[in-house]
């Protein structure tokens, strides 16, 4: 069996490497690569904006008869994402950038313009200093002044940082928090005072209105008679029961009273009972009664006799 991984290869005795034909490819052969847009651009066909960093499947080729210090220049072909129009741009090794060729316009980039301006100023300065020694001295003086200003600003920043380093931010926050709490407490006290003042004013106004209404009020009407309680009839004692109780009490009182025995006198004055009536006064039914009454009876006996007379009349 042969080996799974062949390490040695067989070369026949008549092997000649020069006889192996070489693959000849065109010099402008294109390769498909994956790249991102190197700058912001706008399509000339449809006006679609293509932002920097958008990915494309591009075709890459080498530009013929163009090079910078032996470095080849490459051209890329992409298609617009909206109208599929072809857009081409190529590398610029001299400025380490890309240049737009066809199909789109490059959008404004302030950073690139700033870099170009700095390069232009630097180049002009070098050209002036090349043949003018006084210009070199003047530029050095300006540079030294500028350096001194920068150092002074840097020292001020350092001093400021040192001053801020000794500041206790926690204490500042606590103080601010305390002041805020005091302000809130003061606001609450003011609200309470205003509320108390409003309540006092309302009470005073109500008292004034009550006094004025009492002065102008009409005389009070008599109160209506109280309505009887509907359940009071349940607690009433029947009239017959009240009469029976009254009779029992009268009989008991009559039994308790004992009339005093008085000797009968011969004259007719002893037969008169009661107090003589005034002249012209009507005689009562008791005066017509011929039954004699004992003059020595007590008030309880008279009360019992008065009750008996009422029962007889009824």
Swiss-Prot record:
The modification Phosphoserine is found at residues 211, 213, 220, 309, 312, 314. One of its GO terms (molecular function) is metal ion binding. One of its GO terms (biological process) is negative regulation of DNA damage response, signal transduction by p53 class mediator. Keywords: Metal-binding, mRNA processing, mRNA splicing, Nucleus, Phosphoprotein, Spliceosome, Zinc. It is found in: Nucleus. Its main location: nucleus. The keyword DNA damage does not apply. Residues 178-238, 253-314 are annotated as: Disordered. One of its GO terms (cellular component) is U2-type catalytic step 1 spliceosome. Residues 200-209 have a biased composition (Basic and acidic residues). Residues 222-232 have a biased composition (Low complexity). Zn(2+) binds at residues 43, 46, 80, 83. Pfam families: Saf4_Yju2. Residues 290-302 have a biased composition (Polar residues). HAMAP family: YJU2. Part of the spliceosome which catalyzes two sequential transesterification reactions, first the excision of the non-coding intron from pre-mRNA and then the ligation of the coding exons to form the mature mRNA. Plays a role in stabilizing the structure of the spliceosome catalytic core and docking of the branch helix into the active site, producing 5'-exon and lariat intron-3'-intermediates. May protect cells from TP53-dependent apoptosis upon dsDNA break damage through association with PRP19-CD5L complex. Belongs to the CWC16 family. YJU2 subfamily. Component of the spliceosome. Present in the activated B complex, the catalytically activated B* complex which catalyzes the branching, the catalytic step 1 C complex catalyzing the exon ligation, and the postcatalytic P complex containing the ligated exons (mRNA) and the excised lariat intron. This is Splicing factor YJU2. It comes from Mus musculus. The gene is Yju2.
């Amino acid at each position: 069996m042969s080996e799974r991984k062949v390490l040695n290869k067989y070369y026949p005795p008549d092997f000649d490497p020069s006889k192996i034909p070489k693959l000849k490819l065109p010099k402008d052969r294109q390769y498909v690569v994956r790249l991102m847009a190197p700058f912001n651009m706008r399509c000339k066909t449809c006006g679609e904006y293509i932002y920097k960093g958008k990915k494309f499947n591009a075709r890459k080729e080498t530009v013929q008869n163009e090079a910078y210090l032996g470095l080849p220049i490459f051209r890329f072909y992409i298609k617009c994402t909206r109208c599929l129009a072809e857009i081409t741009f190529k590398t610029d090794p001299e400025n380490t950038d890309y240049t737009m060729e066809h199909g789109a316009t490059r959008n404004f980039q302030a950073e690139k313009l700033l870099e170009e301006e700095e390069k232009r100023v630097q180049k002009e300065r070098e050209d002036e200093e090349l043949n003018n020694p006084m210009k070199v001295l003047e530029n050095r003086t300006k540079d030294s002044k500028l350096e001194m200003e920068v150092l002074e600003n840097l020292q001020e920043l350092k001093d400021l940082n040192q001053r801020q380093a000794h500041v206790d931010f926690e204490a500042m926050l606590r103080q601010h928090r305390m002041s805020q709490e005091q302000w809130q407490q003061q606001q609450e006290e003011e609200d309470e005072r205003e509320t108390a003042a409003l309540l006092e004013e309302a009470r005073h106004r109500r008292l004034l209105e009550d006094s004025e209404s009492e002065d102008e009020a009409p005389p009070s009407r008599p109160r209506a008679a109280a309505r009887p309680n509907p359940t009071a009839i349940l607690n009433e004692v029947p009239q017959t029961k009240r009469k029976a109780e009254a009779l029992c009490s009268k009989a008991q009182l009559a039994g308790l009273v004992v009339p005093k025995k008085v000797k009968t006198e011969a004259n007719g004055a002893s037969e008169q009972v009661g107090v003589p009536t005034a002249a012209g006064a009507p005689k009562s039914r008791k005066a017509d009664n011929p039954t004699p009454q004992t003059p020595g009876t007590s008030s309880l006996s008279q009360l019992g006799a008065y009750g008996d007379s009422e029962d007889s009349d009824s």
